[in-house]
């Protein structure tokens, strides 16, 4: 596997055996290296294969502009989600969730947190994904020192739901059988 482009000290793009572009992560992979050099297998921590060439481009741009710790934490959350759910999830989650988490961290640092109006529904209809969201905010607190409100667990859960069903945020539908108690509905 040869380096095509150095994204940062720990992330490079490369070509796999089928000559398809991949993104490779590993400690120091891009440090003091250049395009054309072989990647030592033992230094590879994670390989990202996205099906669409345009998605690879978006992912590389995202990785160039983001702190490594945000990327690593996002990857850990996604790996945890895969292990808990034991089902295939769309690889685009590496783009969507990583971007979301990075932006959410920026918002918290700027004092701009927003409530998630779907919190109750996400907890009710997607309990496994919501628990993964809770795991995610605990991990972010531990690894990055950022304190999110519980609403963020629901936002993260929705990204996971989208990846499970090969959907995007605009197409995510929640089953809604009755008004939530927060709506002030009476029987």
Give residue ranges: language-model regions.
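Conserved small/polar residues in nucleotide/adenosyl-binding loops
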Residues: 176-183
């Amino acid at each position: 596997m040869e380096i095509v482009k150095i994204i940062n000290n720990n992330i490079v793009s490369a070509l796999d055996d089928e000559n398809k572009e991949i993104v490779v992560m590993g400690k120091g992979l891009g440090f003091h290296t250049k395009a054309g050099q072989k990647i030592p297998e033992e230094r590879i921590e994670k390989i990202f294969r996205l099906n669409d060439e345009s998605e690879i481009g978006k992912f590389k741009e995202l990785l160039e502009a983001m702190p490594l710790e945000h990327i690593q934490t996002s990857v850990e959350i996604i790996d945890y989600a895969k292990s808990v759910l034991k089902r295939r999830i769309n690889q685009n989650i590496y783009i969507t969730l990583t971007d979301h988490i990075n932006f959410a961290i920026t918002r918290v640092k700027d004092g701009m947190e927003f409530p998630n109006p779907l919190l109750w529904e996400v907890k009710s209809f997607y309990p496994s994904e919501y628990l993964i969201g809770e795991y995610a905010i605990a991990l972010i607190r531990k690894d990055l020192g950022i304190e999110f409100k519980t609403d963020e667990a629901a936002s993260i859960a929705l990204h996971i739901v989208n990846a499970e069903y090969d959907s995007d945020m605009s197409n995510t539908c929640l089953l809604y059988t009755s008004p939530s108690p927060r709506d002030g509905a009476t029987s």
